[in-house]
From Swiss-Prot:
Pfam families: Nup54. Sequence repeats lie at residues 2-3, 11-12, 20-21, 27-28, 36-37, 49-50, 87-88. Residues 1-104 are annotated as: Disordered. This is Nuclear pore complex protein NUP54.
């Protein structure tokens, strides 16, 4: 059977070779009896691996085919053990070929040594999964929670603190936004942490409640404004118009009374009709005295001064002195008093001008009233 020891020698081997399983010389080494099919020239029989390969096709083809089958069935590496031969023992041909495949140079020795690597506690996939778990872990103290944001809310001063789960970068961004607002907004608002959909839904619920209350207040205010507008149009404007008409009627009545009083005074009737009219007459008399002041006798004094000045002028022209009885020298104080009197008279004339203007306006009103009365009649 194939692979068992036989008494007959193998094909292509000399008859003097030892029995199967015993050590034999390496492949390609010179032998006393040349192999089958090799030339008798010793130069060819003692050649290297290439010469023996081409000189003995049968002996070299079988190990190559079987070696390829073994490589297909069980892949080997340069650092693994040496493959065995077809007969269960190590073949020197395979050993030599393997050494030639491992090292390009026969005398060189290839040594490799890997650097020590620290053991990885978690793989990259495990770390990614752990990061995703931490990002979705809803915990108030979890700084890596993905669903968190800082929103501005109206907060009392005693509750304005930094949340524990907020990073410094996020807090700095929120504070910079707060500093960019107006002073009134900075006093009212403060960053508030919102985590997850639960806090967001609660915040939306509160905002909806505030919006509803604000809308109710706006509706109430609008209804109050409409009510005030209706009251203004229905009550206030007519009241103002009635008061204006009443004022005009009172002015007409006052003008009529004044005309009656003037007519009675012209006829010599100066007696007051009522106590209030008597008091009013006294007040008017006092005001008239204050207006006239010391200039009541101004005209008489002016006439006396004119007479004295004419007499002095005539005496100077005649070259004789004229003594006027009662003539006195006018000192500076008298001139100052006269200037004051003239100034007061000027002011009194201005007041009289204003009185005349008012009288003219009253006359226009009276004329208009007479015209209306004539038209009514």
């Amino acid at each position: 059977m194939f692979g068992t020891p036989s008494s007959s020698p193998s094909f292509g081997t000399p008859s003097s070779t030892p029995a199967f399983g015993t050590s034999s010389p390496a492949f390609g080494t010179p032998s006393a009896t040349p192999a089958f099919g090799t030339p008798s020239n010793p130069s060819f029989s003692s050649g290297g691996f290439g010469s023996s390969l081409f000189s003995s096709p049968f002996s070299s083809q079988q190990p190559q085919q079987q070696q390829q089958q073994q490589q297909q069935q069980q892949p080997s590496s340069l650092f693994q053990q040496q493959p065995s031969s077809n007969f269960g023992f190590q073949s020197p041909f395979n050993n030599t070929a393997q050494q030639q495949q491992q090292t390009p140079f026969p005398n060189a020795q290839l040594t490799t040594q890997m650097a020590p690597v620290a053991p990885i506690p978690y793989s990259l996939a495990d770390r990614d999964v752990q990061a995703i778990i931490e990002a979705y872990k809803e915990d108030p103290t979890n700084p890596k929670y993905a669903f968190q944001h800082l929103l501005f809310s109206v907060t009392e001063p005693q509750y304005r603190v930094k949340p524990a789960a907020v990073s410094d970068i996020m807090w700095a961004e929120a504070m910079s936004k707060l500093e960019g607002m107006d002073s009134t907004e900075r006093e009212r608002l403060w960053p508030q942490l919102v985590q997850g959909f639960k806090d967001l839904s609660q915040r939306l619920k509160l905002q909806d409640e505030v919006l509803v209350s604000d809308r109710d207040r706006i509706k109430t205010t609008q209804s109050n404004v409409k009510m005030l507008q209706r009251h203004l149009q229905a009550s206030t404007f007519p009241s103002i118009e009635r008061l204006r008409q009443k004022e005009q009627s009172l002015q007409r009545r006052m003008l009529r009374v004044m005309r009656i009083i003037e007519g009675l005074e012209g006829k010599g009737f100066r007696l007051p009709l009522t106590k209030g009219e008597a008091e009013l007459s006294e007040k008017l008399t006092a005001i008239t005295r204050q207006v006239k002041g010391p200039g009541a006798e101004l005209s008489r004094r002016v006439q006396s001064l004119q007479t004295i000045s004419r007499a002095q002028a005539n005496s100077i022209a005649a070259g004789s002195s004229l003594y006027l009885p009662g003539s006195t020298k006018i000192d500076e104080q008298s001139l100052i008093d006269m200037q004051e009197v003239l100034q007061q008279e000027t002011e009194a004339i201005g007041r009289l001008g204003n009185v005349l203007k008012r009288d003219m306006r009253d006359m226009e009103i009276m004329v208009a009233e007479d015209t209306e009365m004539a038209l009514d009649s």
